[in-house]
Amino acid sequence: MIKTSWEGNCFLNFFNNKASLGNVDKTIFKSKSTSPYKLLKSTHDQEGRCILPVLHTAGGLVGGDSLEFEVNLEKNSKVLLTTSSAQKVYGSVGISKINPKGTFSKQKNLIKILDNSHLEYLPQETIIFANGLYEQKFKVSISETSSFLFTDLIRLGRSSSGESIESGVFRSKLEIMRNNDLYDDWEYVDQIELSKESYAAKSGMDYMPVFGSLIWVCEKDFSASKINNLVGNIKKIFNETDNNLSIGILENGISVRFLGSSSQEARKCFFCIWKQIRSVSGFCEPKYQGVWPLQDSMNY
């Protein structure tokens, strides 16, 4: 039988190459990957942060595809990971007598962040086409002196062409564990399922096709007053948009939700929040990445 699904994997190991960028430590990496993953050229900012775009060469996922993405940050590393295009999930493959409703495409993400390291994982949006079935799982292990920023933006269907998600389903599970010398603590757990029912429900998405999450887990000893100032600045961003946004304060960090009709508006909101997080963390101001949609760059 000819295999029609992808089984791809990508392993990235980042580490500090001390004082290789003038007087600034530079983060470099080693990698191992198979199709459909492809790594584009990495760059560095003035703080030595490694900026790496990842490309999915197959153009999208269909039922039965299975991907594994593993990221390790060694001590004293700074990394910005992103993707060069939106992730598209199609519903045309995977339907059979055994699975009449289709088969899920799946992605497993394993992330480990060691001492004094900081990972920003900001992929472009995931688009669930009609009848697309997609499940993603994240397991993140982070030290007490490190931070993790993650954005997850989902569009259900192509509303511009009148297409809905129909029988499609999006599932996501995020687990973040904090490591210390004695035991591991649960830092954050989030589980989401989006479907036609939740899309139409008044208590759900209420026919808004774009749903986004921004999660920032900071260092264990991060200043509470700085987090309060951050929340105040983010609320000012909320006042400048007509979209539905909410913010929650975690034990160590924040959680932001977006609900609206425009992916571009969601990206803009998250970029503005990212700038605030960089500022309160004492890092340089982020720049719009060249692999992101060109039309957005005019608004930032």
UniProtKB/Swiss-Prot annotation:
It holds the Pfam family UreD. Signal peptide: none annotated. It is found in: Cytoplasm. The keyword DNA repair does not apply. The gene is ureD. UreD, UreF and UreG form a complex that acts as a GTP-hydrolysis-dependent molecular chaperone, activating the urease apoprotein by helping to assemble the nickel containing metallocenter of UreC. The UreE protein probably delivers the nickel. Belongs to the UreD family. Its main location: cytoplasm. This is Urease accessory protein UreD.
